[in-house]
Amino acid sequence: TKLTQTFRSNQGIANVASGFIQKNKSQLQKVVNAIDKTTSKVVEINFLTKAQEINEYLTRTIMEINNASASSGKKKSIYILGRYKHHKPNLDSILPFLRNCTFEFKTIHSSKGLQADYVILLGLNSGGSAFPAEKEDDPLLNLVLPQPEIHNFAEERRLFYVALTRAKEKVY
């Protein structure tokens, strides 16, 4: 079935996610239309590598969402998504200050089928435990898996698509 409408993400997020996944020509080519037609300022890219910088950025971003939510009167949800569980940041220090939003860390796999107002993606850099994963699969596992795909990182691209499309309003 060719699903062409999304109720979860806005049009800007749908455009970025679709464009990314469809770089793989084996993927079903389609145009995805969102109910929310917003396309401006819906994906923000930051390149941070040091743990302290990442924690400061997360704290600042979550507090900005919290404060904006106070103004709108609507409590907002945030997913912090990482490729692996060890990407989970320690943000316990800001919990007492959050009245207008909630945040939760999830792996990208565990976020499938879920939605949050905002998504912050972690670990989008190169390396062994980064995203996309560069670790080789266990040779025994390869015996039961289907043949490798022609397009590099095809499964990682699909997983990244999942991560992007968990957000309703904005992806960081």
Regions found by a protein language model. Name each.
Residues 74-75, 101-102, 106, 111-172:
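Conserved helicase C-terminal RecA-like lobe
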Residues 22-25, 51-54, 123-131:
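A polyampholytic, Gly/Pro-enriched intrinsically disordered region
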Residues 7-10, 14, 55, 154-157:
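Amphipathic alpha-helical transducer elements in NTP-driven molecular machines
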Residues 7, 85, 126:
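Short, glycine/serine-rich, charged loops/turns that create anion-binding
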Residues 1-36:
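Conserved coupling/interface region of RecA-like P-loop/ASCE motor cores
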Residues 49-114, 118, 123:
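Conserved helicase/translocase motor-coupling segment
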Residues 30-60:
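Glycine-rich phosphate-binding "P-loop"
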Residues 16-17, 58-62, 160:
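Structural preference for long, well-ordered alpha-helical segments in enzyme cores
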